[in-house]
Every structure is written in structure tokens, then in C-alpha cells.
Amino acid sequence: KAVVLGKAGGTAELPCQASQ
């Protein structure tokens, strides 16, 4: 899920990785 959001948002990729 985090990967999909990151690709759609772009900047979301950074916070998503931190969450993982």
C-alpha cells in the first residue's frame, strides 16, 4: 500500500518508507 501511495503522491514516498 505504501508503495502505491508514494508513486501517486511522490513526496509521500519519503514518509511512507519511514512508516515501514
From Swiss-Prot:
**Could you tell me the superkingdom of the organism this chain comes from?**
Eukaryota
**What does this gene product do?**
Accessory protein for MHC class-II antigen/T-cell receptor interaction. May regulate T-cell activation.
Q: Tell me yes or no: is Membrane among this UniProt entry's keywords.
A: yes
Q: Which GO terms describe its biological process?
A: adaptive immune response; T cell differentiation; T cell selection
Instruction: Output the Gene Ontology cellular-component terms.
Output: membrane
What is the originating organism of this protein? Answer: Ovis aries
Query: Which protein are we looking at?
Result: T-cell surface glycoprotein CD4
**Compartment list:** Membrane
Q: How does it sit in the membrane?
A: Single-pass type I membrane protein
